[in-house]
Amino acid sequence: MFTLSDFDFNLPPELIAQTALPERTASRLLEVDGTVAPARLVDRRFAELPSCIARGDLLVFNDTKVLKARFFGQKASGGKIEVLVERVTGTHTALAQIRASKSPGAGTTLRLADAFDVTVGERVEPFFTLHFPQPCLTLIEQYGRLPLPPYIEHDADATDETRYQTVYASNPGAVAAPTAGLHFDQPLLEKLDAMGVERATLTLHVGAGTFQPVRVENIAEHRMHSEWYDLPQSLVDKIAATRARGGNVIAVGTTSMRALEAAARSAEAAGRPLAATQDETDIFITPGYRFRVVDRLVTNFHLPKSTLLMLVSAFAGVETIRAAYRHAIDERYRFFSYGDAMLLTRRDTPEHA
């Protein structure tokens, strides 16, 4: 059984990327193949991705769009608060985290961005229900601030508002970006299209829980946060066609991976083939997991002891990922949301400690 300590590593803080590179495709790409021994590691630029994949392969993107979900405000008493919208639940309602000296009670009015008032409704641990006076998405877009990850040390600016979104983001609802997609620009997508590489999208609204640390040494005791996803029939059809022609299904990002695998696992448990799905998932992928859909994965470099590091270790192999991360640190790759990327190939033999 793997423990939390098995997923720890020392990362020089200067390797945590604080800003995006001027060009999306200028980031580096570490191609990793753990199906051979020793693992094959190839240093590339992300612009070289088309040379790593083949005509007839399918790239699956997450088209969620990051909300300007962060607000500063005050209580009627004048006490300062910070609000992070976690999920829009209705036209005028949302779930949110509230940081305050004292938690507000139901019926409390909060002033946000010195622009409008919201009313606190029922508690849905660990969140509060907020009632907005106008459509949530309109007020969030107009008055909110982009929520950057906790390890990025500057406040969001105009550059972040562009670069912390994918070029294909179209469904507002996330509070964190599906960062593997940040490396794609329109010319690269057009080049892949011209090659005959297929594209499809799903939606998974990334929650703030993606940054939630694992606090138990026995990782089997960790409880994942839940996120909403939508897997459309058009994607299901493209996966079937890709399988029929012998192509690879390539998930762009761990969020795409989690949605695909959650839907496939649910379908298998129900004794039916993969089908269009709208659902919640708290899937927690660790070494020993049997992958059902995804053959290859584009992903960034993840935090020590994180659930996402466990996911990529399950996919490519624990020792393969350890070797890849050692190499990336030695070669001064940039880490986390604004950092560089990896292209991983699935290990067909699940690992157990």
UniProtKB/Swiss-Prot annotation:
Main location as per UniProt: cytoplasm
One family name in Pfam for this protein: Queuosine_synth
SUPFAM superfamilies found in the cross-reference section: QueA-like (SSF111337)
Entry keywords, A to Z: Cytoplasm, Queuosine biosynthesis, S-adenosyl-L-methionine, Transferase
Enzyme class: transferase
Pathway of action: tRNA modification; tRNA-queuosine biosynthesis
Reactions mediated catalytically: 7-aminomethyl-7-carbaguanosine(34) in tRNA + S-adenosyl-L-methionine = epoxyqueuosine(34) in tRNA + adenine + L-methionine + 2 H(+)
InterPro entries with a match to the protein in the record: QueA, QueA_dom1, QueA_dom2, QueA_sf
Biological process terms in GO annotation: queuosine biosynthetic process; tRNA wobble guanine modification
Domain of life: Bacteria
Any GO CC annotation of this UniProt entry: cytoplasm
EC numbers: 2.4.99.17
Subcellular location: Cytoplasm
Subunit structure comment from the entry: Monomer.
Family listed: Belongs to the QueA family.
PANTHER family named among the record's database cross-references: S-ADENOSYLMETHIONINE:TRNA RIBOSYLTRANSFERASE-ISOMERASE (PTHR30307:SF0)
Cited function: Transfers and isomerizes the ribose moiety from AdoMet to the 7-aminomethyl group of 7-deazaguanine (preQ1-tRNA) to give epoxyqueuosine (oQ-tRNA).
Name recorded for this polypeptide: S-adenosylmethionine:tRNA ribosyltransferase-isomerase
